[in-house]
Amino acid sequence: MIIAAFLLAGATNDPISGTWEGSSLCQVKPSPCHDEHVIYRVKPSAPRHYRIDAYKLVAGHEDFMGAIDVTFDPAAGRLGGAVGKSGRPMGQLRLTLENTRLTGGMTQPDGTLYRLIDVTKR
């Protein structure tokens, strides 16, 4: 019982886990990319590792875009991980934590900034 309470208390202090909402804006135009209102649901998968389930809002409904596994560097306040689809690498996600806000972007494999991301924890 004490261990369960300790684990629950620790989970509430996790600065990364939870629901994040904001914008994901295209930086490469023209491209198939669209500016989006996004919701990220973030859960721990291992110590300092998280899974981001990414959704975009379409006509008021959440449309699942995919999952991204990221690693958190608490000293730097940074999250990062590879982005891919069907086993094909599509680039890197890099976000910086500042209080209840994550900002950063997604780059293509050649390093070109593809999306600017700015989300706030709900």
PLM regions and their residue ranges:
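N-terminal functional modules and adjacent low-complexity/disordered segments of proteins
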Residues: 2-3, 74
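Beta-sheet ligand-binding and adhesion/scaffold domains
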Residues: 16-39, 71-122
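Bacterial Sec-dependent signal peptides at the C-terminal "C-region" and cleavage site
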Residues: 3-14
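N-terminal glycine/threonine-rich, aromatic-flanked beta-hairpin/loop signature
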Residues: 31-70
